[in-house]
């Protein structure tokens, strides 16, 4: 499972890959990343891998959620076969959530599983996609519907890389961090409420603390329920709404933006069902807005929206099961939620 030996959170750790990876040995290595990222990191990564005497190739994947596809999956496997990767080879994922999900999935299937190392470069990947062993790709009908559980050998999280992350992607990463506060940590939630000026400045020391706390929360869930059959479902707070928002908008919303809207919908619904208070709902919405994250939906057909929610992999026999908040730091799972209540929530939350 996750422990201090296989994930590192340290500014500038990507400057010294040899120190963290020299105990490992691989026959061949493939780096999967985006073209723009490779321009930024090619010299640094190449120098480090030469020091390790690793024989590597690079596979460039287009940016965007649409790259989590069977087309790109097949490209990866063809590359592996062309470069004669064997069971003692390694896949390095350099990038955000899309790269981690895709690289992890193709590695988990190739020769029934080869090792991965994650070098996440977005905040969302640092606190979510790289942690926990979930991998997955999308189809035209569902998000992350094809996937596996495959823990990386190593995760190197370098908060310094966030200095060059776009404002939009930086803000989107905080949706998952706010989620951790809502499901498990009132202290983290309050810390975010009171520290926003430093967060906006991307203070490295502060970010290390926030990332450490976020990863520690996810680690507890993963260790308690690795295969996502019980309490780990709480990590999906905001995601059942959010995944549909992503799909129906054709991924015009970043994952974190969609999760922010999803959490707002979930809190409103919870309030209508008498499970939480308006104060809890308003605190969450205020923090998301402080992070400049959206909390309102665009106009989507309601019947289509609830139909897609019922197809979510957490559902059963067409029912819609949701994680809903009771208070900051505590959520509960509600099974077979009335679609009419959901439609009312969606209608209320749509942009006027």
UniProtKB/Swiss-Prot annotation:
Binding site residues for NAD(+): 63-68, 97-101, 121-122, 134, 143, 161-164
EC number: 4.2.3.4
Subcellular location field: Cytoplasm
BP GO terms, sorted: amino acid biosynthetic process; aromatic amino acid family biosynthetic process; chorismate biosynthetic process
Coiled coil region boundaries: none
Annotated cofactor note: Binds 1 divalent metal cation per subunit. Can use either Co(2+) or Zn(2+).
Binding positions for Zn(2+) per the UniProt entry: 176, 239, 255
Pathway stated in the Swiss-Prot or TrEMBL entry: Metabolic intermediate biosynthesis; chorismate biosynthesis; chorismate from D-erythrose 4-phosphate and phosphoenolpyruvate: step 2/7
SUPFAM superfamilies, per the entry: Dehydroquinate synthase-like
Major localization class: cytoplasm
Function of the protein: Catalyzes the conversion of 3-deoxy-D-arabino-heptulosonate 7-phosphate (DAHP) to dehydroquinate (DHQ).
Assigned protein family: Belongs to the sugar phosphate cyclases superfamily. Dehydroquinate synthase family.
Designated name of the protein: 3-dehydroquinate synthase
Organism: Protochlamydia amoebophila (strain UWE25)
């Amino acid at each position: 499972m996750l422990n201090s030996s296989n994930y590192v959170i340290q500014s500038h750790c990507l400057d010294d890959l040899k120190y963290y990876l020299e105990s490992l040995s691989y026959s061949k290595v493939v780096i999967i990343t985006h073209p723009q990222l490779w321009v930024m990191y090619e010299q640094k990564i190449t120098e480090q891998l030469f020091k390790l005497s690793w024989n590597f190739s690079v596979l460039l994947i287009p940016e965007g959620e649409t790259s989590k596809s069977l087309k790109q999956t097949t490209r990866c496997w063809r590359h592996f076969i062309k470069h004669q990767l064997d069971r003692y080879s390694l896949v390095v994922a350099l990038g955000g959530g899309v790269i981690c999900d895709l690289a992890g999935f193709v590695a988990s299937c190739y020769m029934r599983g080869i090792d991965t190392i994650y070098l996440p470069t977005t905040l969302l990947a640092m606190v979510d996609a790289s942690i926990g062993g979930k991998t997955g790709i999308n189809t035209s009908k569902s998000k992350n519907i094809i996937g596996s559980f495959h823990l990386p050998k190593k995760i190197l999280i370098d908060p310094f890389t966030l200095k060059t992350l776009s404002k939009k992607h930086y803000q989107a990463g905080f949706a998952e961090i706010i989620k951790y506060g809502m499901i498990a940590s009132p202290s983290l939630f309050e810390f975010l409420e009171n520290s926003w000026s430093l967060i906006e400045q991307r203070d490295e020391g502060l970010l290390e603390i926030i990332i450490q706390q976020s990863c520690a929360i996810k680690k507890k869930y993963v260790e308690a329920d690795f295969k996502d059959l019980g309490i780990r479902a709480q990590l999906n707070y905001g995601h059942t709404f959010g995944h549909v928002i992503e799909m129906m908008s054709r991924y015009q919303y970043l994952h974190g933006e969609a999760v922010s809207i999803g959490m707002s919908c979930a809190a409103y619904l919870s309030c209508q069902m008498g499970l939480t208070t308006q104060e809890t709902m308003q605190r969450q919405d205020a923090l998301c807005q402080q992070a400049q994250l959206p909390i309102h939906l665009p106009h989507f057909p309601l019947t289509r929206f609830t139909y897609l929610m019922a197809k979510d992999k957490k559902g059963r026999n067409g029912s819609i099961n949701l994680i809903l908040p009771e208070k900051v730091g505590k959520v509960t799972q509600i099974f077979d939620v009335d679609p009419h209540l959901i439609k009312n929530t969606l209608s209320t939350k749509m942009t006027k």
